[in-house]
Amino acid sequence: QIERMANKMDLVILPIQGVSDDGFIELKKRGYCMKDFFASLRKETLIFTGVITPYIKKLPQTVISLLAREEVVAANAALTAEGILAMVIQNTPRSLPEYRYDVIGFGHCGRAIAGLFHQLGLEVRIVSAHAHPESAQLPYSFIRLQEWQFQQPWPVVINTAPAEVISEAMVAGWQTQPLIIDIASRAVGVSERVYKRKDTHVI
C-alpha cells in the first residue's frame, strides 16, 4: 500500500540506520523491502536519513544525512546515553555504584555514555581498538580491545562499536556473565550465538 502513495510524497524520513545494500529497512526487528517504494518516488522528493548507505547513494532523489550535522550527532549521543542509563537501572538488581562499567568504542556515543556515567560517580573503563592520545587527561581507565577480549569483563558491558567484538568463545570463557547492552548499528557487536545462550543477558 505504501508504494501507491510514494509518488505523492514530498518528504521521506528513514530510520537512523538508513537502507541496507539490498534495499531493506529494519523496523522493530523486522525487515521490509523498499525497492518498489523508492522506484515510485518522484525525483523531487527529499529523503532524510541518518546513515547514507551505498543503496541510498544510488537514488536520484536529494538525500540529507542528519548524522552529518554535528549538533544532531551530539544531541543523539546525549539521548542515547540517557537511554542506556535507564536500561541499566531496569535490568540490574542493585544500585548503580555497586557495578563497574565497560564501554566499548570511543566515538560520539561511547564518549557520551562514559561522560554521563562518570558524572554520576560510576567507575567506567573505555575499551577501544585504537589508542587515544588524550586518554591520560580523561577520568576513565583505558584498555585495548585486543587485551580486553582475553579478560573477564566488568559487570556491565555497553558496546557502541559497529563490529563484532563479543564472540561465543569469549563468553564461554567468562567466569561470571555480565549484563551486555549492544547499541551498535544493526546490533552487530555481539555474535548471534551469544544471544541464544541461556546463561547470558544481552539487550
Question: In which residue ranges do the predicted regions lie?
Answer:
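NAD(P)-binding Rossmann-fold cofactor-contacting core
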Residues: 1, 120-138
